[in-house]
Amino acid sequence: MKALLIAAGVAALSSTAMAAKLDEKVPYPKADAGFTRQVIHLPKQDAEDAFKVEIIAGKTLEADCNQQRLGGELEEHTLEGWGYSYYRLDKVSGPMSTMMACPGQKKEQRFIPVVGEGFLLCYNSKLPIVVYAPKDVEVRYRIWSASEKVEKAVSE
């Protein structure tokens, strides 16, 4: 009986922990129809001002040897009453492509990124990065860090 009570207690605590994980996103709005809410949790860094986060949104499309890009703008919004930022990618245009000939080369599935304004963000591990994007857009990210070495400009 005691083992059963302990097991029930552990199950209750684990479901509470799972609910607490979901509660972190409560103040953020639900995704609109046709959109997904994608969340990035960053690890804590010692000097977070020396880091940036690049949001790399895109689609996996059939592509040839040409350089391809999608167009879009990642817009920052503020959650009313909370002051938290979230980001929205409303429209994705394209793909745009260079026009090289690719004789004899088969097309293959490749991740094609969205390029435009607003994709480089300040690093803040205290809050999640919440991105609303169309359902067919995948959100990836890359961490950038500043070099310790600082160069001096030369007067000319």
From Swiss-Prot:
Main location: periplasm
Pfam families: Ecotin
N-terminal signal peptide: 1-19
Cellular compartment(s): Periplasm
Keywords (A to Z) from UniProt: Disulfide bond, Periplasm, Protease inhibitor, Serine protease inhibitor, Signal
Residues the record marks as site: Reactive bond: M99, M100
GO molecular function: serine-type endopeptidase inhibitor activity
SUPFAM superfamilies assigned: Ecotin, trypsin inhibitor
Disulfide bonds: C65-C102
Alphabetized InterPro entries for the sequence: Ecotin_C, Ecotin_sf, Prot_inh_ecotin, Prot_inh_ecotin_gammaproteobac
One Gene Ontology cellular component annotation held by this UniProt entry: outer membrane-bounded periplasmic space
Family statement: Belongs to the protease inhibitor I11 (ecotin) family.
Subunit field text: Homodimer.
HAMAP family: Ecotin (MF_00706)
Entry function: General inhibitor of family S1 serine proteases.
Protein name in UniProt: Ecotin
Source organism (scientific name): Pseudomonas aeruginosa (strain ATCC 15692 / DSM 22644 / CIP 104116 / JCM 14847 / LMG 12228 / 1C / PRS 101 / PAO1)
